[in-house]
Swiss-Prot record:
Protein name: Cyanate hydratase
Family assignment from sequence similarity: Belongs to the cyanase family.
GO molecular function: cyanate hydratase activity; DNA binding
Organism this protein belongs to: Escherichia coli (strain K12)
Domain of life: Bacteria
Gene from which this protein is expressed: cynS
Length: 156
């Protein structure tokens, strides 16, 4: 039976335990996701408490991380999503995403509406990918793809 969570703390505690196990075992998120049939970004989001894993994937991930049965069950429960503190992020990486939306949020909104009409980009029917590519000017660049289904606003 599908279960739901109403408290974010239990999943945040599980995420801390998962990250500790991941570090002890020297596993990457890609290695943990391997064999689940799910995208690395989706499995990572589940491990960090923002998505629910199907039972088979939760068991596979649980075995790789030596999680107990309760933790494997928690990974399958629908989490309280978007439960990051309601304040400006202080972590430098997360702050840069916040900053990007502060600078480009209105641009993204204007372009989405111009190209699609009044509506939103779904975060439910959504895919995320992060790639590291060489920068022709030296160093490396991050290519982040946000791929969400467009959902038009419908008058009623």
């Amino acid at each position: 039976m599908i279960q739901s969570q109403i408290n974010r703390n239990i999943r945040l505690d599980l995420a801390d335990a998962i990250l500790l196990s991941k570090a002890k075992k020297d596993l990457s998120f890609a290695e943990i996701a391997d064999g689940t049939g799910l995208a690395e970004a989706f499995v990572t989001a589940a491990l960090l408490g923002q998505q629910a894993l199907p039972a088979d994937a939760a068991r596979l991930v649980g075995a790789k991380l030596d999680l107990d049965e309760d933790s494997i069950l928690l990974l399958q429960m629908i989490p309280l999503r978007g439960c990051i503190d309601d304040r400006i992020p202080t972590d430098p990486t997360m702050y840069r995403f916040y900053e990007m939306l502060q600078v480009y949020g209105t641009t993204l909104k204007a372009l989405v509406h111009e190209k699609f009409g009044d509506g939103i980009i779904s975060a439910i029917n959504f895919k995320l990918d992060v790639k590291k590519v060489a920068d022709p000017e030296g160093g490396e660049r991050a290519v982040i793809t946000l791929d969400g289904k467009y959902l038009p606003t419908k008058p009623f």
